[in-house]
Amino acid sequence: PLVVHLLDPLHAEETYERVLPMLNQKSILVVEGIGCSHHARQLWQKLRHDLRTGVTFDLHYCGLVFFDTARPKQHYVINF
């Protein structure tokens, strides 16, 4: 599987659009700082609702996006 790590919330959206053609059903996207700013929260919402994404996990400090669209679209918030 391909794992892509988006470190910079300010440039994450353009990086996501750039790597999107390389992602497949086995890909995982790690998004840092999903709650650190208004822009980061908006991007996280956009990724969660994108029809090309499947299961998402909100870990508070980062988010995980899986692209296996064969599974039902689902969002989880993990509190620990």
Give the label of every model feature segment.
Residues 6-8:
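Active-site residues of response regulator receiver
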